Amino acid sequence: MARPEHRTRPGATYFVTTNTWQRRPVFQNPEIATILEQRIFSCRDAGNFLVHRHIIMPDHIHMILTPGMSTSLEKAVQLIKGGSSRQIAKACGTRFPIWHQGFTEHQIRDQHDYDSHSKYVDENPVKAHLAELPHEFPHGSAFGKFVLDPWPPASGAEAPNSSHPLSAGLKPRPSARP
């Protein structure tokens, strides 16, 4: 079966979901989940996209991202999945399939849509009985480990990539909170 074509718009914000290979609970291991989380934010710090929300569940991830003007959503997801696969293989000393091919996306339309998807991301571990409160789950945006980017329409920020004239003033945020 052919993978669906993604039709992404430069500067738009997306809710993205991707699953592990055969829905295996790879990210139940905190060290592996940390590798993925660090990969997401190192790609962000390199100016590839903005990260507004994320959650790393045992067998899938949800993110709200705004790709850079010269980075497609497909490329952003490829950077995260490909880089994390290599880093996980190195840490484990062996290669094994991490990711299911492809991903699903939903373009965020307005503030209400952004708020409802943010709430869904933050509450995902509570619904799965992995935490009692969103901020108790260590591999998600509600935990507060990483500085998040404001949603561009709400903040006036531009999509990243310094090659784009509108984003020249955008500076990468430090990944970890002081």
Residue ranges of model-derived segments:
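Short catalytic/metal-binding and nucleic-acid-binding patches
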Residues: M1-P178
